[in-house]
A protein has these predicted regions:
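Active-site-proximal helices and loops of the catalytic beta/alpha 8
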Residues: 1-10, 58-221
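Core domains of carbohydrate- and sulfate-ester-processing enzymes
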Residues: 1-38
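Short, functional N-terminal and low-complexity linear motifs
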Residues: 22-29, 53-57, 155-161
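Active-site-proximal loop/turn and secondary-structure-junction residues that shape catalytic pockets
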Residues: 27-32, 41, 78, 108
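General secondary-structure edge motif
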Residues: 36, 43-44, 150, 174
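Short, solvent-exposed coil/turn segments
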Residues: 38-40, 159-160
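Active-site mouth loops of central-metabolism enzymes
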Residues: 42-55
């Protein structure tokens, strides 16, 4: 248990909550949303513990060498100390001898917050969440949107070399906790905006490319 910060269940008292283990403290290098959003779910891994760092270094090397992947997608970055990835990514590249381009999901509409993270972790790119929300707003505005200002306040506008643009993903589709689905009528235009733009690295969602016939939520674009 000493490799974790805390959990959301006290078995002794059968109480739900966010419980910080004795002798631990939440990481300071996370988003200040809700005060401190280090804890997200399950058992929160203590990524500043030297034993945990050594194991994640070992696991990262094993995973890259076993699977042969040539890039990484990092999830829920705002809940993990930025200082961990600032060290882990360069070390993994050094140990494996691979470039391993990385893109992270830092879910925030505030481009300044994304820029701050990239300053702390220059070894990764980030998904352009502000742009996604601009596209979502445009698709639900009944045509009342100034498209000439669509890229204002976006990561691709501020730091195009490290911005990964996207229209939709698994979190934004209907039924998800972060659902902010781009309306079907606007999706072809949204993809034209990201795919035909010189700046940024575009990413196409599987569900938009092939549809999601299992649920019928999203038609193929």
């Amino acid at each position: 248990w000493t490799c974790f910060h805390g959990t959301d269940w006290d078995e002794a008292r059968h109480l739900a909550g966010v419980w910080l283990f004795e002798g631990k403290r939440w990481n300071d290098h996370v988003t200040d949303e809700l005060g401190n959003y280090d804890y997200l779910m399950g058992a929160d891994v203590h990524v500043t513990d030297p034993r945990v760092c050594a194991e994640l270094d070992r696991w990262g090397r094993w995973y890259v060498e076993t699977t042969g992947v040539d890039g990484l997608r990092l999830d829920a970055l705002k809940h993990v100390g930025a200082d961990f990835f600032a060290r882990w990514l360069p070390e993994l590249r050094r140990a494996t001898g691979r470039d391993l381009p990385a893109v992270g999901e830092y879910w925030s509409r505030d481009v300044a917050e994304l820029e701050g993270y990239l300053e702390a972790v220059p070894s990764t790119s980030l998904f352009d969440v502000p742009l996604h929300f601009h596209l979502h707003a445009a698709s639900t505005s009944n045509g009342d949107t100034d498209l000439s200002r669509l890229f204002e306040g976006t990561l691709v506008g501020a730091d195009p070399a490290r911005a990964v643009t996207f229209v939709e993903n698994h979190d934004t589709q209907p039924g998800q906790s972060l659902a902010s689905t781009i309306q079907p009528w606007f999706k072809p235009s949204a993809y034209a905006l990201v795919l035909l733009r010189e700046a940024g690295t575009p990413c196409v969602f599987w569900g938009d490319l092939f549809g999601t016939p299992e649920t019928g939520d999203l038609p193929a674009v």
